Amino acid sequence: MRAFISLDLENIGVKKEIEKIHYELGRIKAKIKLVETSNLHFTLKFFPHIEFEDINKIIKILDNLQLEEIKIKYNDIGVFPNYNKISIIWIGIDQESANQILNIYNLINNKLKEIDIHKDQKFLPHLTIARVKKCEDNKYIQKVIEKYKNIIFG
């Protein structure tokens, strides 16, 4: 079974800003899968194959964590892996916000190590807002990215 641990985006104002970007991306002649605003999240850990028993252990750990609400400042937009072959369009966050999420990531990682459910993964805090399946000409996506390049909200 596949599973992941994430922090959900709950800020309605941020969701409205992302909807503006979604609108423009939706007008591009390309096969782009927009992430519904109700599903926007920061993935902390991804488990491509995990046993059901391990999921129960993880749930116990997560239920016992004492986390406070964090404020995130969004200040960038970009693509993975690059403009020649765009597969992900993401929203970035400022360094202070990244540090807060990284602290939560490390806390969870350390708890998972205690129960031997841990695999080191590269972690770069970002919010995936769209997946590009097929695009004949990336310049239109690039124009939308450039328009919102210096966004600051949150």
Task: Set out the residue ranges of the language-model regions.
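Histidine-dependent nucleotide/RNA phosphoesterase domain, centered on the 2H-phosphoesterase fold
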Residues: 1-154
